[in-house]
């Protein structure tokens, strides 16, 4: 992004544990953790009704006492200011485009993306060549499915001993609601409708200050029905009587979507390789049972940084920071993720069995169980042919509570020059039409929450158009 926080979607519940370790006096320093969670609600939804789970029945992972509802964009900006105050140089607006390797094959830095290229990749009069940024160690913190992180995992086979990774798409809106409906500190999580019981996912409402409410839906990408549209599921979620009442009379002010890495501890790849390490969601440290990853990103960043500093003080470079994974093994974060290791595998077996087993493990046994449940399949292997399913009839947007993709993207704080290079490219041009469209009815035109993928006809033949 053009500035720190530009790519962060506001509205998150943050566990301050790692931040307190990093800056014990964060309150005095003015960290923007302003709205402490005051109340938790967990609802099971059917199409027209809801059931609130009594708080005494909720597992600890669903409780948020001591946590804060924050604008994560503001938190990252504040962290950036603290880093710069300590002498750290930050280069916003310069994406890392390529990995640099030395003669032995170890990572030795990155190359930033070249600026001022046209749609065909040719230099314009605004051209600026990317820069080489070299270091003794490089830590990759791109977030979920980072494009360099994926390359590193493949090159060094970092995931060869891990379970298949599992992902979700999280779609979120920020609303300004009527003052009478604002309840700062209230956290609401829901399960059930609008998703089918065999589709992993859940929803949330976070009441921030200043009459702001963040609302979102997470859909696991292991769903079976290729006609499912996470965007449309989110829009109709807001039509539920229990949810709609919060937003009637309000105004939507921001929209966005992000990938989530949700496989958990058993899907974590090896975190280190010659010359660097993966941290945060680039590795997959999200605790899916808590829907929280920011505290894990801070903690793993600290552990990797401590390992790198120790190595440099020993005049080392470009080797493996083995003290980072060992420090993680001995950390409270490993304990937390270990207790939640079965959450995603259980929930992948359906809402009812998953809820029963998660309740047993997390509420009755506090996550301390002798067994481990493993994910067996990658998400894409779960998608079934369109012939086995019926198209889903989603309600038309009303422009008040529900909206279309185009108007949503307009308020997503994303923009690009029409003549800039397409940043999404296909490995095999024949796959979209010959497989995706023919067998699965073109699911990419539905799963993308920004309408990037579109099937159009050219000379009477369908082709996939990428609008990016």
Regions found by a protein language model. Name each.
Residues 1-49, 335, 339:
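N-terminal FAD cofactor-binding segment of flavoenzymes
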């Amino acid at each position: 992004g053009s500035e720190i926080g530009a790519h962060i979607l506001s509205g998150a519940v943050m566990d301050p544990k790692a931040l307190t370790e990093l800056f014990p006096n964060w309150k005095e320093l003015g960290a923007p953790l302003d709205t402490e969670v005051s109340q938790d609600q967990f609802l099971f939804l059917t199409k027209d009704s809801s059931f609130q789970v009594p708080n005494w029945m909720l597992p600890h992972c669903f409780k948020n006492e001591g946590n804060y509802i924050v604008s994560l964009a503001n938190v990252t900006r504040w962290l950036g200011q603290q880093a710069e105050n300590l002498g750290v140089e930050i280069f916003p607006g310069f994406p890392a485009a390529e990995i640099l390797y030395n003669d032995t094959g170890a990572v030795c830095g990155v190359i930033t993306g070249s600026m001022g290229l046209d749609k065909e990749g040719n230099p314009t009069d605004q051209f600026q060549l990317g820069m080489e940024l070299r270091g003794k160690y490089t830590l990759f913190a791109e977030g979920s499915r980072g494009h360099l992180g994926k390359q590193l995992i493949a090159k060094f086979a970092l995931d060869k001993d891990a379970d298949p990774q599992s992902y979700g798409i999280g779609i979120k809106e920020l609303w300004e609601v009527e003052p009478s409906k604002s309840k700062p500190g209230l956290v609401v999580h829901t399960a059930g409708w609008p998703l089918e019981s065999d589709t992993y996912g859940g929803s949330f409402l976070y009441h921030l200050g200043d009459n702001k409410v963040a609302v979102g839906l997470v859909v696991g990408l292991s769903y079976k029905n290729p006609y499912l549209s996470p965007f449309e599921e989110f829009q109709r979620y807001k039509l539920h009587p229990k949810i709609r009442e919060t937003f009637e009379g309000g105004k939507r002010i921001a929209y966005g979507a992000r990938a989530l890495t949700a496989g958990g501890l058993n899907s974590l790849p090896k975190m280190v390789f010659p010359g660097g390490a993966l941290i945060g969601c680039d590795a997959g440290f999200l605790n899916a049972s808590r829907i929280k990853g920011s505290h894990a990103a801070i903690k793993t960043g600290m552990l990797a940084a401590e390992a790198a500093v120790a190595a440099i003080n020993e005049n080392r470079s470009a080797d493996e920071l083995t003290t980072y994974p060992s420090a993680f093994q001995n950390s409270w974060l490993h304990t937390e993720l270990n207790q939640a290791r079965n959450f995603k595998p259980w929930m992948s077996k359906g809402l009812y069995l998953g809820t029963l087993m998660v309740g047993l493990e997390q509420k009755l046994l506090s996550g301390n169980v002798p067994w481990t449940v493993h994910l067996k399949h990658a998400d894409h292997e779960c998608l079934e042919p369109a012939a086995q399913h019926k198209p889903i009839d989603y309600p038309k947007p009303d422009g008040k509570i529900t909206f279309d993709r185009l108007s949503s993207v307009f308020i997503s704080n994303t923009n690009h020059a029409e003549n800039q290079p397409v940043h999404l490219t296909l490995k095999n041009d024949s796959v979209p039409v010959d497989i995706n469209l023919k067998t699965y009815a073109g699911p990419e035109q539905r799963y993308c929450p920004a309408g990037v993928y579109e099937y159009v006809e050219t000379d009477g033949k369908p082709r996939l158009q990428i609008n990016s």
